[in-house]
Amino acid sequence: MSWRKGIYKLPFRLNFDRFEDVYPQLKNQRFYGFKELSMAPGVNDESLIREKISGDIFNRAGIASSQTAFYKVYINFGSGLWYCGVYTMVEVVDDTMIENRFGEDDGNIYKPESDFTSFVPDKFEKKNNKTEADFSDVVSLINTLHSPLRTENPAQWREQLEAVFYVDHFMKWLAI
């Protein structure tokens, strides 16, 4: 979008483990504890602070959220530094971030493109544990959401839902 507007300010990612398969000596390479960072140009946010403020609010409320910070970005294309503007650095949700927030990284991280009416594997892209074809956590959530117990026995349905989904955490997130 910014490129079409004639603005030389594009989003980009920094992945510090990108070449660990090719160069094993780079395995688990981190930059100040981060495995991957996303640099957002904020072209749709004239204030440039929405993402930073929302992340801070979530973190202060005890809801796991990506760390954010502001950076002035300069790039050297060989003829000196080119000022690209102020970017919002956003911690990418990955196994490192999950382990830092929850003390473990055993669960799956998904980037869903689903409406959760049914389970379609192509609609749930795994961001970790990609070699394991275990989607039982998502299947269990979808089955619970659509269980007839929802109307027949709401108390039992709620109990089953809370066993597979952090309802209180979600409600807190929704409120903010």
Specify the residue positions occupied by each region the protein language model found.
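Phosphate/dinucleotide-binding and metal-coordinating scaffold of catalytic cores
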Residues: 1-176
